[in-house]
Amino acid sequence: MSFEVFEKLEAKVQQAIDTITLLQMEIEELKEKNRSLSQEIQNATSGRESLAHENEQLKQEQQVWQERLRALLGKMEDVQ
């Protein structure tokens, strides 16, 4: 009788070990996915900052061109 109890206990312990091993593997997979997503977020943030800087430069260029165009139109009106 005690041998049967020991076998059942051994089976339960082995099942617990298997479950723990699977959970550890899942944790490692989730950690890797988390690292990957963190890198993607960092890249996206960097890209956003770059685009914001480029946008600001383009706005400044547009402002310069608008001022030049206004000056040119003013000269054309003076000629007429």
Swiss-Prot record:
Coiled-coil region list: 3-80
InterPro entries (UniProt xref): Cell_div_ZapB (IPR009252)
Intrachain disulfide bonds: none
Superkingdom of this protein's organism: Bacteria
Record keywords, A-Z: Cell cycle, Cell division, Coiled coil, Cytoplasm, Septation
Gene Ontology CC terms, in alphabetical order: cytoplasm
Pfam families: ZapB (PF06005)
One of the GO BP terms on file: FtsZ-dependent cytokinesis
Subcellular location: Cytoplasm
Family, similarity comment: Belongs to the ZapB family.
Known role: Non-essential, abundant cell division factor that is required for proper Z-ring formation. It is recruited early to the divisome by direct interaction with FtsZ, stimulating Z-ring assembly and thereby promoting cell division earlier in the cell cycle. Its recruitment to the Z-ring requires functional FtsA or ZipA.
Subunit architecture: Homodimer. The ends of the coiled-coil dimer bind to each other, forming polymers. Interacts with FtsZ.
Protein name: Cell division protein ZapB
